[in-house]
């Protein structure tokens, strides 16, 4: 019995040694990259993708007006068609296949920012492929990421997926939020989420 306890103790000591000397042997967690800057001192980048009614773009612009920072639209190298029905079909195929389109250059260097606010519409219960590409291909260690999404009543797993991707790439995620808009094709740009909720969310980012 003493021999067994001795082996266990030796194993624990060895594991502790690896933890101390081999950072690559342990998972990189958002807590290890905690941001110490107050919000007022953070340099902010707001990125978004918007295709039809421009709801995601509208919220991104409201955020920039209130919080400041740089505003950038995410664009695929191969643009989507103006044919809505065609893009609906294409979007479903891309989402179900986990497609990540190549993106045009942002025109800015992410290294220069402390906080990145990321907006996406909902495509077939998931984030738009363009945003999937952005969140999958960048290193967010040492940064705060604020995800938001717009939907017409079917939020799916968008926020959960965005948080998971951002944290997986090293981000500290804060204030993730979903905004609901009308599903009436004549009023796609009418926000159902109370304006007060949007305003409070923006205040929390200041």
Features from the language model and the residues they span:
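FMN-binding flavodoxin-like domain, especially the glycine-rich phosphate-binding loop
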Residues: 2-77, 89-206
């Amino acid at each position: 019995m003493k021999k067994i306890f001795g082996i266990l103790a030796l194993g624990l000591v060895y594991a502790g040694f690896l933890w101390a000397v081999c950072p690559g042997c342990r998972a990189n967690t958002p807590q290890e990259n905690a941001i110490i800057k107050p919000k007022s001192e953070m340099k902010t980048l707001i990125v978004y993708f918007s295709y039809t009614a421009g709801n995601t773009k509208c919220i991104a612009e409201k955020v920039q007006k209130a919080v400041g920072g740089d505003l950038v639209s995410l664009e695929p190298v191969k643009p989507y068609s103006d044919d809505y029905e065609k893009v609906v079909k294409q979007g479903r195929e891309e989402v179900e296949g986990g497609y990540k389109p190549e993106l045009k250059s942002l025109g800015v260097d992410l290294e220069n920012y402390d906080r990145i606010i990321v907006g996406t519409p909902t495509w077939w219960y998931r984030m738009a492929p363009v945003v999937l590409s952005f969140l999958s291909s960048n290193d967010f260690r040492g940064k705060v990421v604020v995800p938001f999404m717009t939907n017409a009543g079917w939020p799916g797993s968008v926020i959960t997926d965005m948080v998971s991707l951002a944290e997986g790439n090293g981000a500290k995620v804060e204030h993730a939020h979903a905004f609901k808009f009308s599903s009436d094709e004549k009023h796609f740009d009418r926000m159902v989420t109370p304006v007060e909720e949007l305003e409070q969310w923006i205040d929390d980012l200041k």
